[in-house]
Design a protein with these regions (language model features):
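Positively charged, low-complexity terminal tracts
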Residues: 1-105
Length: 105
């Protein structure tokens, strides 16, 4: 697992009845994403004095449900700009290829 630069930005919020935690991760932050037998994980790291780290684990069934909802949401709104569309399309194709059956050899 290695950290990669964040090329855009992310915001994370966790709401509890008596408090909320909010963190932003921008171009000076890093991320890691990995898969194991049961789930995927996304880790966001903001280094420095105000260091923050957020990790989310999603089991494959939930990840599939989230991807379906994201597809529905994107289809129901005005088309994304060309750069974001191309970036997402390239990533989706790479995900698709990684899920193709592999020979046992």
């Amino acid at each position: 697992m290695s950290l990669h630069p964040i090329s855009d930005k992310a915001e994370v919020s966790v709401d509890f009845p008596d408090k909320a935690y909010i963190g932003s991760f921008g171009r000076h932050s890093q991320f890691d994403a990995y898969a194991d037998d049961d789930s995927v994980a996304v880790r966001l790291v903001r280094p420095g004095e105000d260091r923050r780290e957020a990790v989310m684990h999603l089991h494959y069934g939930l990840l599939a449900d989230i991807l379906v909802e994201l597809a529905r949401s994107l289809a129901s709104r005005p088309q994304l700009d060309e750069q974001h569309r191309n970036d997402l399309n390239k990533a989706a194709k790479q995900l698709w290829r990684s899920l193709e059956p592999r020979s046992a050899g």
